[in-house]
Amino acid sequence: MNLLIHDANILIDLIKLDCIHYLFSLDYEMYTTNAVRYELYDEQKRILDIYIAENKLKIRKIEDSEDDEVTQIFNENEGVISYPDATVYYVSKKMGGYLLTGDQNLRLFAEKYGVEVKGIIWLFDEMKRKKVLTLSLYKEFLKKLEEMNPRLPKKEIEKRIK
């Protein structure tokens, strides 16, 4: 699979870590949705707009003809997933790409309905595997990520840092 559909939280984490540019060195077609972009702060939008202009990140607009289905997914699962979550789930299901998220509720929901989900640790593993990151940068970013996001699986990060 050569397609990644991004939820907001992973994009935000990569911007906070100041390593978003490494993401777009990966050989994947990358999308997010207009609803996810709307969730971002103006500065985060400005950063991503650079990659959108370079066609490295594509915005998948939910068309009016699709909105009823996305809204139904959201309404039937309100309190579990947000509307932007429903959009990235819908796009991942429709396009067949990996859904990238750090949101546990979205992960469980998407997996329940057959969408393959990956997280930020997988993404860093990919950047190392594809030699986008050196081993030292990989470990440095994982350490910063662990400090920034204590909800991540500490054991998984620790075994990669050693």
Regions found by a protein language model. Give the residues of each.
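Active-site-proximal, substrate-binding regions of enzyme catalytic domains
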Residues: 2-97, 104, 115, 140-142, ...
